[in-house]
């Protein structure tokens, strides 16, 4: 059975991710404590189900400590992947402000009977408390930062991640702009800001690293080709180590100043090379479609 566990910070898009799994034919359960996941898996396996999606988060905080052991036990018999959704505190505060929903940790105090007593924990404090409590889970999961991501874009990303379950590891190349921040979900980060910048050519400025004139410009620069080759060699050298570690995903982030030209070109070039090695995805954060 393929089991995908969705966890992460409240307000970061877990419901969206679980809905994508459900639309893809997964048997989905929201807010299931970790200790019940093995029992549910055994039952569904006996019934002939092949795909299970489970969301578990701070609402089941008493059992979260059991999740790593649960994942290891399930992985002995099933294909298990953990996706951890996160977002910046500013983005989360904005979302809570728009929806007017209460954060789980601001709604009650630990150990309160009858559903808990309301307290005065500020929203930002609740978010940071949750981030601290969940940090051990994030370390062992595939992280997705949804801070600047629209709902439709997140849906597309999740669809891509679950599209092909025949590969042991999905390799994701992500371009980004340093002026918008480094992706928190990256496993490797490469800085290509020292390369010649098409931005300073007025004819190339409105284009992207996927457009032929920009590609021709960058491919004509020996420095660009040399750096792309060095990054390729590094990733290829260490990729077997990540596969041996039973990783489901590896995110390689390529950053330039604005995330429009150089990083996009390098990410596309690397993806084209590594597609021969298995399941490869490309994400251009700053070129994400509207909607």
UniProtKB/Swiss-Prot annotation:
Amino acids binding GTP: 57-60
Gene Ontology MF terms in the entry: ATP binding; GTP binding
Pfam families documented for this protein: PapZ_C, RapZ-like_N
Coiled coil, from the record: none
Residues noted as binding ATP in the record, renumbered to the chain: 8-15
InterPro entries xrefs: P-loop_NTPase, RapZ-like, RapZ-like_N, RapZ_C
Protein name: Nucleotide-binding protein RALTA_A0325
Keyword Ion transport among UniProt keywords: no
Family per record: Belongs to the RapZ-like family.
Purpose of the protein: Displays ATPase and GTPase activities.
Keyword Ubl conjugation (UniProt): no
Keywords, ordered alphabetically: ATP-binding, GTP-binding, Nucleotide-binding
